Amino acid sequence: MTLSMFGYASTDAFIKFIGLILPLSEILFIRGIIAVFLLFLLCYLRNEVFVSINKNQYKFISLRIFGDVGCTVLFLTALINMKLANATAILQCLPLALTFCAVIFLKEKVGWRRWSAIIIGFFGVLIIIKPNSDGFNYYSLFAIGAVFFIVLRDLTTKKLDPGIPSTFISLITAISVTFTGIIFSPFQNWVIPSVEIFLSLAATAVFLIFGILFNVMCMRIGEVGFVVPFRYSIIIFAILYGVIFYNEIPDLSMVAGTVIIISTGLYTFYREKFTKSKNLQ
């Protein structure tokens, strides 16, 4: 999972730079074409281009694609218009959102301790986005929206048949994101990218594939309670990229909010693990 987060953080760092020059739809399309080509080549070499899929898997695959497309569009929009570390930190309330959605949609029972962690964790998000101050950036709402699309993506990933190759899932996801760029293209003015920008987009495609493959493998075969905490490693990568390339020094509110989000997220997972083990006794 740490390798997956490195891939995603590296992609984000490049996208933030490219987003100052190219519109998002063009970024999605060009990066997508490169990613689709590389993934198709990988699937071909592994004889996984044509896969037999049970009909009852179609809905889960479709929901996963919808979740991935939604989180990609919303998060990249936020990323281009926010500090890299801030946008990334907001995404780390994912474990809290997973628990919240499990209660609302899956009717899972959650005690007062985890409810308290959820409330405190979302308070940490508020500290980062500063809704009542002059420093409020409404693009942070896009990052929050992306979280719930990631919840949809990850929950449906766990429902996928283990027999479906991770590379194939990554390929059809990349194709869908690429078509999303085409759909939004009439609403944005595309420009001819320079060689430097094109190479940067190629790098984002490589890092994206890196992140997707490891993420799919971890979420499918890993124990969620063990794997998900390693998502927080992306904060470290995002801060380093922000400081080195964008001179974005984390402020006190960002640090405080991030600590709260990570602490409550870890507590929520370990409390859930404790509750399940207690019920099995």
Per-range role (PLM):
Residues 1, 55-65, 110-122, 139-144, ...:
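Cytoplasmic-side transmembrane-helix entry/capping segments in multi-pass membrane proteins
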Residues 1-26, 134-159, 279-281:
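Glycine-/small-residue-enriched transmembrane alpha-helix faces in small-molecule transporters
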Residues 1-3, 36-63, 112, 162-164, ...:
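Membrane-interface interhelical linkers
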Residues 5-10, 40, 65, 69-73, ...:
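Hydrophobic/small/kink-forming positions within alpha-helical transmembrane segments
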Residues 29, 53-57, 125, 130-149, ...:
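Juxtamembrane helix-entry segments on the extracytoplasmic side of multipass membrane proteins
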Residues 30, 87-93, 160-176, 213-243:
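Helix-helix packing/entry segments at the starts of transmembrane helices
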Residues 75-77, 94-116, 236-255:
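C-terminal transmembrane-helix exit sites in multi-pass transporters
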Residues 113-130, 253-272:
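Hydrophobic transmembrane alpha-helices of multi-pass small-molecule transport proteins
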